[in-house]
Curated annotation (Swiss-Prot):
Tissue: Expressed by the venom duct.
GO cellular component labels: extracellular region
UniProt entry tagged with the keyword Cytoplasm: no
Disulfide bonds: C1-C7
Localization, UniProt: Secreted
Family per similarity comment: Belongs to the O2 superfamily. Contryphan family.
Comment block on domains: The cysteine framework is C-C.
Listed name of the protein: Contryphan Li834
Organism of derivation: Conus lividus
Keyword Disulfide bond: yes
Major localization class: secreted
GO molecular function, one term: ion channel regulator activity
Function: Its target is unknown, but this toxin may modulate voltage-activated calcium channels (Cav) or calcium-dependent potassium channels (KCa).
Length: 7
């Protein structure tokens, strides 16, 4: 995942 909750 990245910084924002987006996997």
């Amino acid at each position: 995942c990245y910084r924002p909750p987006v996997c």
